[in-house]
């Protein structure tokens, strides 16, 4: 009979803890994880918001590093995978994303991870709603061949 009341009250016979206490512990762990996640978030440098990037693109400044579109082989693309020279292909188009690195909302590491290669699959997995042609129109290098 006592075990029935303990079950109704949410008390564990094994350790005497209540479900309420366990719930608080779980809540505390979740809050701690959230704090750590916020603490580790990338902080966008001043002057590098999405609006700042949009203004740079609207200025018409050529950020591609080439005067006119070129044909880019996979071998050539692979040479451009550093923070100082970062290209990636998305949907058959190659972009010089070097200038965009400090503007990316989660930081340059995510872009650099996929630089120098055809990044279409990972790009679409995380950015299927983003119009990369508009976002990177002044960074267009050419076509992947």
Swiss-Prot record:
Q: Span of the secretion signal? A: none
Modification type Phosphoserine: residues: 68
Looking at the keywords, is Protease present?
no
Q: Name one Pfam family in it.
A: Cyt-b5
Which residues lie within the region annotated Disordered?
A: 1-49
> Basic and acidic residues: which segments have biased composition?
22-32
Recorded hits in PROSITE patterns, A to Z, give:
CYTOCHROME_B5_2 (PS50255)
Q: Which GO terms describe its molecular function?
A: cytochrome-b5 reductase activity, acting on NAD(P)H; heme binding; metal ion binding
Q: Which UniProt keywords apply?
A: Cytoplasm, Heme, Iron, Metal-binding, Phosphoprotein
Binding residues for heme, per the UniProt record? 104, 127
Subcellular location, record wording: Cytoplasm
Which GO CC annotations does the UniProt entry carry? cytoplasm
Outline the extent of the Cytochrome b5 heme-binding domain: 69-145
SUPFAM superfamilies noted in UniProt: Cytochrome b5-like heme/steroid binding domain
Compositional bias (Basic residues) spans?
A: 33-42
Known PANTHER family for this protein? CYTOCHROME B5 REDUCTASE 4 (PTHR46237:SF1), CYTOCHROME B5 REDUCTASE 4 FAMILY MEMBER (PTHR46237)
Please report which protein family the annotation says this sequence is part of: Belongs to the cytochrome b5 family.
Q: What is this protein called?
A: Uncharacterized heme-binding protein C330.03c
Q: What is the lineage of its organism?
A: Eukaryota, Fungi, Dikarya, Ascomycota, Taphrinomycotina
